[in-house]
């Protein structure tokens, strides 16, 4: 137990004192604000963005020097006549600037890791892609048996997030500033839920960056136990007496954490908890997966250990029902908009020795990914592209747009869904989604022109909708025109793209 505490303290003691002077530099806030409003990843520009500029930010900083900082946020409804923004605009600048500053150490750590490898390094933007997770699952999970499907609880108290930064930010004023920004959007006596609480801090797009940093910092704190256990278990492979004593000593610490009474006759069975070197951990947002080659009993021990350890040391309430034990060969795993499983593909090999011949039955494990068509249709129904049965309907709110704009919107949605679900082994589900979007687009245009769908197609022709029906194979041909003969038929197989950085609302139906 003491060794684990020293490990966590070592991770937390990595301070970056050089960041403190940046908090008081006005150009940091100007740069962070300008970069925040210049980015448009999968989002449309708003009118508020057009009103923002670097000159406005400089004027805001100048007026911040002339006002009492404790009076700025007292009345949010009071509008600043000089700038044309609410007084909440000040907190926006501070939160964006502070989020930019605290991200610097992690960016430097990424640069140092890239410089250490020098050659044969994967580009960082490829590692950031969501699809980069699936090749890892395909290579690793086909050899594993069980996994823990963990749903990380998201209600986090404001003070817990602030306490996470106290280990490496020793400046009290900075911590009070973060606490003030968080409490501005939620009561200090409540917990804020990222996706449900309408008045929560995270729902404010302008402060989402700071919240995501604080939340991920908190998650990384209790994820660090996996690195500690892996380092310990990696040196427990020898059977010498000296290492055996280390095993007993280390298992005693695990026993203290999980509060389990270990008997002598159960020692070898319980030792398997830390003996297993083949553990794989993957997390994206609130979804975490812990897979192993062990048995169901082994995964139950890990479940008990994780729930107890995280609750005692990180104030993270894990209900046991949030962690499911899944057998890969029998059940599907819902992850990142896919249904993943490990299928057994039987194969028969005929062998002959001299005059005798016999058949050998082999079963090869294969990692398979499918598109969950029912939840995807439910997402389309929630966004009014179809009804609950999957029948396409018109989109009345888009009927006032131009024809080209309507077709472009439907086509963009269709291409994004096809692009994201290109890793599916069966493409028939995507054809149904394309059909729903195409007919919904046609009905929207027919509604705008006060005509029927058949009359609309007869008058304008079906080629008007071919823009968003481009297949994945056509996209590959446009991307690699010289390799068209080589890529023929590739679209029927699974394709993982390394340029997908976020999940759309239609895919993230949960």
UniProtKB/Swiss-Prot annotation:
Native organism: Penstemon heterophyllus (Foothill penstemon)
Record flagged with keyword RNA-binding: yes
GO molecular function terms listed in the Swiss-Prot or TrEMBL record: RNA binding
Name of the protein described by the UniProt record: Maturase K
Family: Belongs to the intron maturase 2 family. MatK subfamily.
PANTHER family in alphabetical order: MATURASE K (PTHR34811:SF1)
GO cellular component, one term: chloroplast
InterPro entries: Domain_X, Maturase_MatK, Maturase_MatK_N
Keyword hit for RNA-binding: yes
Biological process per Gene Ontology, one example term: RNA splicing
